[in-house]
A protein has these predicted regions:
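Active-site machinery of serine-nucleophile hydrolases
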Residues: 163-165, 172-229
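C-terminal catalytic histidine-bearing segment of alpha/beta-hydrolase fold enzymes
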Residues: 298-304, 320-403
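Short, solvent-exposed loop/turn and secondary-structure capping segments
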Residues: 83-85, 161-163, 176-182, 216-221, ...
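A domain-start/cap signature at the N-terminus of enzymes
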Residues: 1-28, 33, 47-163, 398-403
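Gly/Ser-rich "nucleophile elbow"/oxyanion-hole loop immediately N-terminal to the catalytic nucleophile
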Residues: 157-161, 215-252
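Primarily recognizes the serine-hydrolase "nucleophile elbow" in alpha/beta-hydrolase
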Residues: 237-238, 243-288
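Solvent-exposed loop/turn segments at secondary-structure junctions
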Residues: 79, 171-175, 210-215, 252-256, ...
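Short beta-strand/loop motif that positions the catalytic acidic residue
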Residues: 293-296
């Protein structure tokens, strides 16, 4: 009978509001490990402190008494666990390191045997969970321009049924040559896919990747804005997508691009969740009948005053506007309750801002951009906002309505 041995090593990655991070290293053995005998001191991941070790039945399974997988939980406070780093050219760099793992002492198996120690074995695989469920592809427009994108499809598609699609557009700081950057920079794309995976609100999720700035403070956009709408139209023809439930959301530059797409393509989006961005108040009045929820920080020196002016202009033109401010540090239940209260007023335009510096975590130095950047780290965590988006749908003659 063969002696127990190590089979392979995998690094686990989780999406996070502040950027994807490596959370654990998983060692697969040929035989079941005895969990109660495991000690984190028996292992080493070079350069990455371990805070716990446990056995499980699957790579991402819960703690088990015995299991063929040993999860080495990494210290989340270690900056090296973060995959996203800002490069010298102010472009997002994605780091996918190969971790080196050592088992210092023999490991007790459930059979009574031992797995021999090993030194400096490489983690050859990276399991990024829901991020890996996105396919990566490219689209060529009618004018010959190429746009790369990530697309999540519902795990179970019922024949004859159509599903909503969520378009997520990233910020300027996430511009990168790495097509997966929109999925790794935060949760603006992955949160919808994760809920779909759990069977809640199944949907498609589209996350294009832009390599350069596509919208500026002069309210100008590049060809990528029209190309993204063309891509959406193409996907609607290829997949079981409900054209009455095309949703858009974006942060900073992404918010700005969606505003322009909305102006150029009225009645295209059923609703838009716009985070930490602003657009031309002189033109936004034309979108008075669109369905929007705008979330900014009260300390955001651009997004707060400019988008408020735009929304007031939309109200003056005939739109129905509801406003509220919330403390970003309130617990999840309170934030959901506040958003639902605002939603109950049945406005097609909603404006919510985070009070004071509440969006900025303690311990972080406050500078001009912190209110801005921290907004989307919080906004996509609010379940009631995600629920609101999926309640909307188009009907003949426009304004989107609740299901």
């Amino acid at each position: 009978m063969k002696e127990p041995q190590m089979m392979e090593i995998t690094t686990l990655v989780e999406a996070h509001s502040a950027g994807a991070r490596m959370t654990a290293v998983v060692i697969e053995y040929s035989d079941a490990v005895l969990g109660e005998k495991l000690r984190m001191e028996d292992f080493q991941v070079e350069g990455y402190p371990i805070v716990a070790a446990c056995a499980s039945d699957t790579p991402r399974g819960t703690v088990a008494r015995t299991g063929r997988f040993v999860q080495l939980i990494l210290d989340e406070q270690n900056p090296a666990t973060r995959l996203c780093q800002m490069g010298e050219d102010r472009r997002l760099q994605i780091n996918r390191p190969t971790l080196m793992v050592t088992q210092k002492r023999p490991i007790e198996m459930a059979s009574g045997k031992q797995a021999a120690p090993f030194e400096q074995q490489a983690s050859e695989h990276m399991d990024a969970g829901v991020i890996d469920r996105f396919l990566t592809a490219s689209f060529t427009t009618k004018t010959g321009q190429t746009l790369r994108y990530n697309l999540y499809t519902p795990e179970k598609i019922v024949r004859g049924q159509k599903y909503p699609v969520v378009l997520f557009i990233h910020d300027l700081g996430s511009c990168s040559e790495d097509v997966q950057a929109p999925l790794l920079q935060g949760t603006g794309a992955t949160v919808w896919a994760l809920e779909s995976d759990y069977g809640r609100r199944p949907c498609f999720v589209l996350a294009p990747q832009y390599t350069r700035q596509c919208a500026n403070d002069d309210f100008e956009v590049t060809w990528e804005a029209d190309a993204t709408v063309e891509l959406l139209e193409n996907l609607c023809d290829l997949y079981a997508i409900d054209r009455k439930r095309i949703y858009a959301t974006g942060q900073s530059m992404g918010c700005m691009m969606i505003c322009e797409m909305m102006l150029r393509n009225p009645n295209f989006f059923a609703a838009s969740l716009l985070v930490a961005g602003q657009w031309d108040p002189a033109r936004m009045a034309k979108a008075k009948n669109e369905t929007l929820w705008v979330v900014v920080s009260g300390g955001d020196e651009k997004a707060f005053p400019i988008m408020r002016k735009a929304l007031y202009g939309m109200r003056a033109a005939g739109g129905s506007l509801c406003e509220a401010h919330v403390n970003a540090r309130a617990d999840a239940a309170m934030l959901d309750a506040l958003i639902r209260t605002q939603n109950n007023r049945n406005c097609n335009l909603n404006f919510t801002w985070f009070e004071g510096r509440s969006v900025i975590p303690d311990g972080l130095e406050v500078h001009g951009g912190m209110h801005h950047i921290c907004t989307w780290k919080k906004a996509y965590d609010i379940k009631a906002l995600r629920e609101w988006l999926f309640e909307q749908r188009l009907y003949e003659g426009r304004i989107s309505v609740h299901d």
